[in-house]
C-alpha cells in the first residue's frame, strides 16, 4: 500500500485566493445594561434576518446572594414568557480553597417539558467583586417547521467562593417562531451587567 504525502505547504503552491470568505460575522443588534432591573427583555431584532443569534452577557451581578440567572422565550413578542422547554445541564467547579472539585450532570437544574425559566448559573455570589459571564446561542428562531435549539456556556462566581463552568443545551418545543427572550434572576434584581444581542451572518 502506498502512502500519499501532502507537501503543498508553501505560499508559492497556492493557485488562487478568494476575495473574501463569508460566514461567521457578528452583527450587533442591540445592547441592554442592567441597573437594579427585575428583568432584561429583548422584544425586537429576533426574526428571520439571521439563522443564528448570540446573546453575550457580561459582568452580570445580582442584588441577592445565592440566586440563579435564567432565561425564557416568547412567541408573542414578549407579551408572555413560558414556552415549553426540554434541556440538559452539566458543570464543573473548583473552589478557592482547592479542597473541592467536580464535573457532573445537574439533575435538579434541567427541564423536561417545562414552561419554567431555564437557569444558566446557580448560587450566584453578590459580593462587590462577584459576577458572571457567558453566551447563549439561539438557532433559527423564526423557523415554523422545527423546534428551536439553543446552547449556552457560562462562568460565574459561586456564593461559596467557587469557580463554576456551566453548560446548558436544549430546545423550545414549539414550531411557532421565537421572537423575544427574557433574562432574570430567580429572586431579586439584576443589579448590574450588560447583555448584547448579535446576529450571525
Predicted features along the sequence, with ranges:
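Surface-exposed molecular-recognition determinants
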Residues: 2-201
Amino acid at each position: 500500500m502506498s502512502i500519499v504525502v501532502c507537501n503543498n505547504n508553501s505560499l508559492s503552491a497556492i493557485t488562487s485566493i478568494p476575495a473574501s470568505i463569508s460566514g461567521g460575522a457578528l452583527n450587533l443588534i442591540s445592547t441592554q445594561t442592567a441597573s437594579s432591573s427585575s428583568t432584561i427583555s429583548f422584544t425586537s431584532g429576533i426574526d428571520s434576518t439571521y439563522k443564528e443569534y448570540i446573546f453575550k452577557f457580561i459582568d452580570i451581578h445580582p442584588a441577592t446572594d445565592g440566586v440563579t440567572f435564567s432565561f425564557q422565550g416568547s412567541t408573542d413578542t414578549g407579551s408572555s414568557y413560558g414556552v415549553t422547554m426540554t434541556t440538559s445541564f452539566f458543570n464543573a467547579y473548583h473552589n478557592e480553597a482547592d479542597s473541592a472539585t467536580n464535573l457532573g450532570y445537574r439533575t435538579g437544574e434541567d427541564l423536561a417539558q417545562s414552561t419554567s425559566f431555564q437557569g444558566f448559573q446557580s448560587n450566584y455570589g453578590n459580593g462587590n467583586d462577584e459576577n458572571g459571564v457567558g453566551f447563549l446561542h439561539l438557532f433559527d428562531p423564526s423557523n415554523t417547521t422545527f423546534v428551536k435549539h439553543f446552547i449556552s456556556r457560562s462562568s460565574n462566581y459561586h456564593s461559596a467562593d467557587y469557580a463554576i463552568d456551566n453548560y446548558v443545551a436544549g430546545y423550545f418545543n414549539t414550531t411557532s417562531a421565537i421572537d423575544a427572550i427574557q433574562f432574570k434572576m430567580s429572586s431579586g434584581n439584576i443589579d448590574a451587567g450588560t447583555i448584547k444581542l448579535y446576529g450571525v451572518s
